[in-house]
Amino acid sequence: FGHPAKDMTLSEAAMIAGIIPAPSAWDPAISPDKAKERWERVLGLMVEDGWVSQADADAAVFPETIDPDSLNRESMQGTNGYLIAHIKQELVNSGAFFEDQITQGGLRITTTIVKERQDEAVAAAQTMNSVNGWDPAHQHVALSSIDPNTGEILAEYGGPDYEQRQQNAVTQDIAMAGSAFKPFALLANARQGGTVNDTYSGASPQTFPGLVEPVTNDGGYSFGNVTLVKATAYSMNTPYVALNRDIGPETTMQAAVDAGIPQETLGLNDQLLNVLGSASPHNIDLATAYATIANGGQRVEPHIVRQVTNSGGSNKLYETTVAPTRVFEAEEVSSIMPALEAVTTGEGTADSVAGALRGFTTAGKTGTSSDQLSAQFVGFVPNMVTAVSMYQSDDDGNSVPLENIGGLDQFHGGDWPVDVWTNYMQNATKSLTEKDFTWIVKSNRNSKNNAPSSVPAPTQEPTQEASNPEPTYEPTRAPEPEPTQTATPGNGGGNGGGGNGGGNGGGGNGGGNGGGGNGGGNGGGGNGGGNGGGGGGGGGANPGAAGGN
């Protein structure tokens, strides 16, 4: 509006309030009719609640806004705009600078971004533009790549053009973790002396105390007794819910928080089905948590700024301090690695990864929304962790399923997200010299058989497996209730059932049985946004279901 917030009129304030749930979708510069519709709604509600009189509301005139194209924003165009906005927000959040100090010049800012890695990330993410059925205006890719030893963000793809969408897919959008949450149960189990060679029943369905509906594996496939290595590779649900019952879901939640999932993450809870990924973290949060594993149990904070000096470089004004915090013992993390490595080899849900990065020890986990609102893969090699998330939104920013993409019947974390991850990592890892994790130590744990003495005979096994049972309490989708709308055009979709070991639903290598849900939250914005983000891509509701591959 061209003036300070304290000088806003009733009309201006009503317009701002109206577009908060989805500012990119309802921006008056992009959708003036929608912005005016929202403005009228706010004024009507203010009259109903007694905040303004009917006469004042009738006299209000829809406000004029400054044409964003008239502003000097060339530097914010394209993919670099997301980096610049992230840098500004990180420095403001540090408390060392005001925004005016950053924008008015006179500072030399050194970032952690490696140009070659950034170019490779952009190229890899934008390979989706050539996929039949992919529409970058509504379908979104988030990619973050970090050094697990320092937390330095090496590359970040937050979207194709910041001027078109001021919502960073990496730091602001959210998506249910789905089966990408399962490694935290492995860590919690390791803390209690468990091992990935512990055995559980893979039978499906299975009933559990406190749940009205039985838990099932993807497509209804039933297995015999399986180790947690196989349960992870195939992303089975029933063994993981049984494991979570034994160790206590509160310990799984705590392991996730210790690894790097923020305590305030939407959907994070201590319920039995949290192991299936009811939490909806940002892409960068998952990358951070997996970096803790890749760093042998030491957590570091992700950051994009290395240091700030005056324009001449002679006076250092700010420097990011790297202070690793040990949250898991190296032996505990070492003990779960066989399960995460199995995901990227053999019949794992990301089995193409190891072959594409020959010579490297690879590990990770896929995740898919049960109704295909999102899909992702978080994988790592020594000294590099990369998370890839994909999701879709409609014109109003609501999450909608990823359908009819590339000729596939279903969209899974083990499909395009793994392809983009591999495309990026094949080039990005050329500069890495370490092929194996140097912190790995021998684990002498005794395995336990936790399976019942009698289980149903296994049905024929699919080539890949995941899963996604639904909780009895969910108003949103597979495992966890979601808010009805998000703050900004966010990545609503979650990771639930489906594909490559996906969710609870039939079809293909996965599928998904999750119910729909309304995601979102009020927040978003800035570095890491807030508890906002919201539904698929362009801004709205419905982050996806959990529990999938």
Spans of features found by a protein language model:
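Second-shell loop/turn segments in exported
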Residues: 1-4, 23-33, 42-43, 47, ...
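Non-catalytic, structured segments within soluble enzyme domains
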Residues: 1-112, 119, 262-263, 272-276, ...
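Conserved catalytic neighborhood of penicillin-recognizing serine enzymes
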Residues: 3-6, 73-74, 194-252, 299, ...
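A penicillin-recognizing enzyme superfamily signal
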Residues: 111-134, 143-145, 156, 162-176, ...
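Active-site rim segments in enzyme catalytic domains, especially the processed small/beta chain
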Residues: 168, 172-211
